[in-house]
Swiss-Prot record:
Could be responsible for synthesis of pseudouridine from uracil-55 in the psi GC loop of transfer RNAs. InterPro entries: Dyskerin-like, PsdUridine_synth_cat_dom_sf, PsdUridine_synth_N, PUA, PUA-like_sf, PUA_sf, tRNA_PsdUridine_synth_B_fam, TruB_arch. It holds the Pfam family TruB_N. Gene3D superfamilies: Pseudouridine synthase, PUA domain. GO terms for biological process: box H/ACA sno(s)RNA 3'-end processing; mRNA pseudouridine synthesis; rRNA pseudouridine synthesis; snRNA pseudouridine synthesis; tRNA pseudouridine synthesis. Belongs to the pseudouridine synthase TruB family. Type 2 subfamily. This is Probable tRNA pseudouridine synthase B. It comes from the Archaea. The active site is at D66 (nucleophile). The keyword tRNA processing applies. One of its GO terms (molecular function) is RNA binding. Its EC number is 5.4.99.25. Signal peptide: none annotated.
Length: 333
């Protein structure tokens, strides 16, 4: 990541904090955990167990896995639930065991796998909790790892919302043998990886260790700040004076920017951060990095989702009358 300075600015440490230095209670309400989901429970049940385990008001998972499916299941804690839709932007990766119902030649299997790379059409299965309309999904990568008789182990990286069970059914039909999904494990879920996932028991042990012995070390290894789950987004760093206005949903103006990540385009989601590295909001850039650096005034990012609660940073903008349609203004010092 390369940040380009638009205007040097300092931050006031009387407000906000470094995300990785938050006290443990704040971290539990603005953090996330990546659970290694076991076979059996639903994703909703796992999220509910985490919520109850950590004595939280709310928690939500970042991508449904069927009960029998295992692997990386990110769980948002407390106020981090508002970040869940952002986790669906990057691709997801799975390792799948596919069983053919008849014998097939290796060359035919390889050709079918190539055929199902790229844009595919899918209709959600009957049990899906969404409307069964035809949709387009992208298979970025699909690789055969091992073939043992009629069993095919493969890895695939695909767009969020792809139904792997349906993919296997469709490939089996195209192959002429029919097939079904025997096992499935998610290895990557957006910005989260299988090797950082923990068992539910590990989370419980770490929480009890903190509550009973006051030792936060193990819990801090497992619970990450919400910013950890947004590291895949390009960034704009804003001045302290602009933070509270953005927290109230105001459009970001050029005058509020301190630094911009190189290569930012208008076709992506951008993360707006404080000078301390705290996530403030995400939005749609109205111009690219080059134009943002040149412009001295005007709107540069349309806010689509506010993450930080208002009031953490001081308000340095004029409150408008409800009938006033003009733009918010910074208070003159």
């Amino acid at each position: 990541m390369e940040l380009i300075v638009k205007e040097e600015s300092k931050t006031d440490y009387n407000y906000g904090s470094d995300p990785y230095n938050r006290d443990i209670k704040t971290l539990l309400n603005t953090g996330l955990v990546v659970i290694d989901k076991p076979s059996g429970p639903t994703s909703h049940e796992v999220a509910a167990w985490v919520r109850n385990m950590l004595n939280l008001v709310k928690a939500g998972h970042g991508g449904t896995l069927d009960p029998k499916v295992t692997g990386a299941l990110p769980v948002a804690l407390g106020n981090t639930t508002k970040c869940v839709p952002i986790w669906h932007i990057p691709p997801k990766e799975y390792v799948c065991l596919m069983h053919l119902h008849d014998d097939a030649e290796l060359v035919d299997i390889e050709n079918i796998f190539k055929e199902f790379t790229g844009r595919i059409h899918q209709r959600p299965p009957l049990k899906a909790a969404v409307k069964r309309s035809l949709r387009i999904r992208k298979i970025y990568e699909i690789e055969i790892l091992e073939i043992d008789g009629r069993d095919i182990l493969f890895r695939t990286k695909c767009q969020s919302g792809t139904y792997l069970r349906k993919l296997v059914d469709d490939m089996g039909e195209a192959l002429g043998t029919s097939a079904h999904m025997q096992e499935l494990r998610r290895t990557i879920s957006g910005p989260f990886y299988e090797n950082e996932a923990v068992y539910l028991q590990d989370l419980l042990d770490a929480y009890i260790f903190w509550k009973e012995d006051g030792n936060e070390e193990e819990l801090r290894k497992i619970v990450k700040p919400l910013e950890y789950g947004l590291q895949h987004l390009k960034k704009i760093i804003i001045k302290d004076s602009a933070v509270d206005a953005v927290c109230h949903g105001a459009t970001l103006y050029s005058s509020g920017i301190s630094k911009i990540e190189k290569g930012l385009g208008t076709d992506e989601v951008v993360l707006i951060e404080t000078l301390k590295g705290e996530a403030v909001a995400v939005g749609k850039p109205l111009m690219n990095t080059k134009d943002m650096l040149k412009t001295e005034e005007g709107e540069v990012v349309e806010i689509t989702r506010v993450i930080m609660e208002p009031g953490i940073y001081p308000r340095i903008w004029k409150k408008r009358n409800k009938n006033d349609k003009s733009k918010p203004e910074l208070k003159k010092k």
